[in-house]
């Protein structure tokens, strides 16, 4: 119970066992087909055990029905390409890569990859018998249809909370924090108490959006417009909460335009609350951006009505923070409208800076999928690396099985499929229990086969062994899974063809060969896995963020042309997020770098630059170009230094920041002082973000937890 709360794993194992045995017995004993029976059983194993299908029971059933034609296609190709070893190996490499690389489309496709791989592996071995293809397809169809029906009728799993609802909870909690800060700024003493009470729940709700806190299938990571928009809105919400805490710490009753800032914050809270209602399904109408846009116009007008000349720069900070929150809220609401399929304003991003922040809203679905496929088609992408690693391993396994004429070469490929991990270290760590388990299972199977039990005994024992095996794997580890699956295979083959103790011997040999192939490929193809790529990807991301800082200040200060720094940084951030997601699935010693803080620093640079370029006039700060350039170069150089250190694995690059340079800021620029304050708030925030990279946050430090909330980090 401790390892399986609610008995979800046991229920799933029982459901798959019942369906697999029913399909196998129907084909073997009722329809009397030794060809259909294995395909019915392994079709259920492929889709019910090796595949991880998310969603409600009805959604999983629909997914099974939708993937059935893909299964027909792969079984047909495997059957036809088994004519020679060369064609089978070529097909294994091509389709092994294609099926694994399809995972760039999102975790839902990743969950189907291993199962669909098995559907090609199963028929790609001799004998070449295209005449039996219809029997193979019929067996697969029976198994998948029975499994689809069982998903909604036999001990169905609970429907998980949709991501949209979780996002609604986080945005609603954010709205309460914003409203409490507005009360604080309006002089209401209860505002501070309300904020202190609301912040823990808001932090928990925001952290619940982290990919690491979600089942893979619920993460909004597909190539489609809706998932991209939900992920963008979640990133804005998490960023907003972190900056709301910064606002709560600003205690300046003499701040310029304090009443206007409080009014803007209250409108921001109201817009966030309306967005939360729609996300949770409590409102039918999707909120628009008109209200927050009007509030931003009113705030700027109120701010422009007060001359900042001669005022200390610190008195302008609060208004700049409030303005940034309003801009990010506008971006969040726009992303939610995209997720809802509602119209949004035209994209006004300059051609030189395309694609813009919400570029995906203006692309077709086919265009979005092509963009996702193309952007990861690089050796620097962990999706590309993983697909190529698996395709090579499966192709080599199929080649050796054909060259040495292994009697059950299918098991070699199945071993590779189930044991190969993303790093060489993780692959090696799975070998010992897998080999020990396989050997133990094979010894028991050999004894049983030597004794020579009647087929009826195998038929009766199969469901029991299968149930325990399917439940033991997730609960007790790969050793138990391999041991019991070896027995399952022996009991299955004993019912479809004459076998003896040599079947167990072949099983051990095939698993050893498959394990050796997995280790060899793991050592040759990107052996560090996510760790090695994460250093490179995050280093590149921070270097790109440095260019964003320089370019943004250049555009706003001296009206320089906006180039491609932002699009490059968005692309680098996407690859860094993918690398971090893979890194989290692997085993690593305690990190010397806070990877969450590293990603947050990059995302804050990108999001802040987007807001500044939308809301600030360009070329208005020439009189203070020298100190502004010095401040920007200080931050950009630090980003570049940390990025280079990550690329070189130099821990000294993440050492605490030196003191910021002492600069003489003008106080007589008129209204342009507000634009200067907006820029300085952004740059100061980026320095704070960089200062957190060298330290690992304590789990119970609420302020630090909030500071590490941004975009998809972790």
Regions found by a protein language model. Give the residues of each.
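C-terminal functional regions that serve as terminal interaction/effector modules
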Residues: 463, 478-487, 499, 689-692, ...
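Cytochrome P450 heme-binding "Cys pocket" and the immediately downstream C-terminal segment
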Residues: 519-520
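Gly/Thr-rich phosphate-binding loop signature of adenosyl cofactor/nucleotide-binding cores
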Residues: 603
